[in-house]
């Protein structure tokens, strides 16, 4: 089919090349022969009057023009797949569906580990990419690059549906021999101590505790920034640093790592972890089933 002189099948080829960055792999992913894919590249170059890709070894490197085109093409194809083409029947125990989930390691060990255990029994063909949180999760959802985002709703866009999963609260931890934690911390002590903090993405986006502390006028003297909660203990051991982290996470750490816990100097509010999915996936039977599993397992958390 042509639209204003463009064979729309070529957009599928361009999208595959943007994903795979390799001619053979892209051809295989959309069931084309390599000669047919090469012909598609020639036609794309002719239509857009741009090279679109340059070769670096066997890798196809997109030009700026291809980078500009890719998001709109991906979104258009996603819309067709999810809203025009009929949904396939979804049978969990027979499915080989692959889900991409953006989340932090705290949610991985507290919640998603239980989901993985359950699905290994009930739907063993289901697979996952568990991806770190990024600077712009809304863009990932809009393009359909992830199936789910799990984070506090504060950091979610209003453009996509979401549902709450569980509540969590924050506590302070330090090395077990940190003498300053033998008594309750004052606000002044908390502010003057060295802190280890978690930041997400290349631009080190703030976390929920940053927002709470800012609301209460508390500042931290940050000495160490890490990219995941699992790195916090290493930043605390043998020092007088402290960290403000989710309480359930401390419960997992304390079985193997000598930490001391104390309450923050002010009563920080609880926060919510929610799951969000692309609006285009809202009626996808597999997506509906997966988010139901998440809600069920979250309800079982202690």
Curated annotation (Swiss-Prot):
Xref: PROSITE patterns: HTH_LYSR
Highest taxon in the source lineage: Bacteria
GO molecular function: DNA binding; DNA-binding transcription factor activity
DNA-binding region: 23-42
Gene3D superfamilies: Periplasmic binding protein-like II, Winged helix-like DNA-binding domain superfamily/Winged helix DNA-binding domain
UniProt KW keywords: Activator, DNA-binding, Nodulation, Plasmid, Repressor, Transcription, Transcription regulation
Pfam families assigned to the protein according to its UniProt record, in alphabetical order: HTH_1 (PF00126), LysR_substrate (PF03466)
Domain HTH lysR-type: residue ranges: 6-63
InterPro entries for the chain: LysR-type_TF, LysR_subst-bd, NodD_PBP2, Tscrpt_reg_HTH_LysR, WH-like_DNA-bd_sf, WH_DNA-bd_sf
Similarity comment: family membership: Belongs to the LysR transcriptional regulatory family.
Function noted in UniProt: NodD regulates the expression of the nodABCFE genes which encode other nodulation proteins. NodD is also a negative regulator of its own expression. Binds flavonoids as inducers.
Name under which the protein is recorded: Nodulation protein D 3
């Amino acid at each position: 089919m042509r639209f204003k002189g463009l064979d729309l099948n070529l957009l599928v080829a361009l999208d595959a090349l943007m994903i795979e960055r390799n001619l053979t792999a892209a051809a295989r992913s959309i069931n084309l022969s390599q000669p047919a894919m090469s012909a598609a590249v020639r036609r794309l170059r002719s239509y857009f009057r741009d090279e679109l890709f340059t070769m670096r070894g066997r890798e196809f490197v997109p030009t700026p023009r291809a980078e500009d085109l890719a998001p709109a093409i991906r979104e258009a194809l996603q819309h067709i797949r999810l809203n025009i083409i009929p949904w396939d029947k979804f049978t969990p125990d027979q499915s080989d569906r692959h889900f991409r989930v953006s989340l932090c390691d705290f949610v991985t060990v507290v919640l998603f580990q239980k989901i993985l255990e359950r699905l290994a029994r009930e739907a063993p063909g289901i697979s996952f990419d568990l991806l770190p949180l990024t600077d712009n999760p809304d863009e990932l959802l809009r393009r359909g690059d992830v199936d789910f985002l799990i984070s506090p709703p504060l950091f979610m866009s209003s453009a996509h549906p979401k549902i709450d999963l569980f509540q969590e609260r924050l506590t302070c931890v330090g090395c077990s021999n940190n003498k300053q934690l033998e008594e309750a911390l004052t606000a002044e002590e908390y502010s003057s101590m060295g802190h280890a903090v978690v930041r997400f993405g290349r631009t080190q986006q703030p976390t929920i505790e940053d927002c709470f502390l800012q609301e209460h006028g508390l500042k931290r003297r940050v000495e160490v920034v890490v990219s995941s909660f699992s790195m916090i203990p290493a930043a605390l051991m043998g020092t007088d640093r402290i960290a403000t982290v989710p309480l359930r996470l401390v419960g997992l750490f304390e079985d193997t790592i000598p930490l001391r816990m104390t309450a923050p100097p002010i009563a920080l509010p609880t926060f919510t972890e929610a799951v969000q999915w692309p609006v285009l996936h809202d009626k996808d039977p597999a997506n509906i089933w997966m988010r139901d599993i998440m809600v069920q397992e979250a309800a079982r958390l202690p």
